[in-house]
Amino acid sequence: METNFILAGFGGQGILLAGTVLANAFMLEGKNVTWYPCYGAEMRGGTVNCEIVVSDTEVSSVHKQDTDYALVLNQQSFDRFIERVKSGGTIIANSTLVKEARPRDDIKYVFAPMGEIANELGTSKVTNVVSLGVLASVCEIVSRDYLALGAVSYTHLRAHETSL
């Protein structure tokens, strides 16, 4: 079975790192995975997203027109990617920065205050890691243990200790 993900936010929110951690977690679970980043010329503040396709069999293409799960950390990303979520799919949004609107009735919505949770942990820099925890709870396709292993292998120990 093939499952498609889009992770999106603005530059500086750690979207590409979150995507890398998620893709690595899938690889550690023995699944086939592709990861494709997309970002503008801006270093911070511009739109950033990555697409991940995970499957038990070989992945045919990374770029899909529709997605099963969209994880969005800001309003611009919500507005941009909501139409890419296929009927029956799920959009998971950071309610700290995204209005809790439901413009479509054929998809599921999950709003979680990811930014607020990160701030309660001491720094907004871990919003991306909080978002992966929410994603793991919602889609149940990747275990939290493998996400933690994925985080350890792609982050510095200090950032890992802060995040987890």
Q: Residue locations for each model-derived region?
A:
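Active-site cofactor/cluster-binding pocket
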Residues: 1-158
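A short, hydrophobic C-terminal helix/tail in secreted or cell-surface proteins
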Residues: 159-164
